[in-house]
Amino acid sequence: IVNYEVMHMFRKLVKGWFSKNSKHYNDFIRALLNGNVYEMNKTMNELSLSMFSSFDTGNRPSERLRPERFYHGFVLGLLVELRDRYIITSNRESGYGRYDVMLEPKNAEENDGIIIEFKVYDEEYGEKTLEDTIKSALIQIEEKKYAQTLTEHGVPEEKIKKYGFAFEGKKVRIGM
């Protein structure tokens, strides 16, 4: 998180979102850290259905950037509470490109590194399902070598979790 004011704003925003849904928040974070994509999908879709509007998430391919930015910001807000264990960065260069979100463990022996890539489903890119969109995100992580920063900082490749988040309106699908 860039600075204290932004961090404070995210914390306040997230606490407001989850004041009635703290179980969902904790479930999502626990699932993310444990690599449990089933629980991540269940929780994120419950949150999406109960909290988001189609005006937030967009419905058409022409709205590709807006929903990606919306989900990107939302997930960053969820991750803010992990700042004591991770260095959380967004839209930084690593390898041959710029990843969406990276969690670099402050202690690589205790915690895994995490890379998250967001994609909006789009038939024009040959995607037939949200699973295709997830595959596209995961391929991008590999082809662009986003893990380079983590490995350079001592996180072994086998301790790096790579997640693709795919979106179509309020539908969310997450894979590894």
Model-derived segments and spans:
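Extended alpha-helical interface modules used as scaffolds for assembling large macromolecular complexes
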Residues: 1-145, 172-176
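Domain-level recognition of nuclease-like catalytic cores that cleave nucleotide substrates
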Residues: 149-176
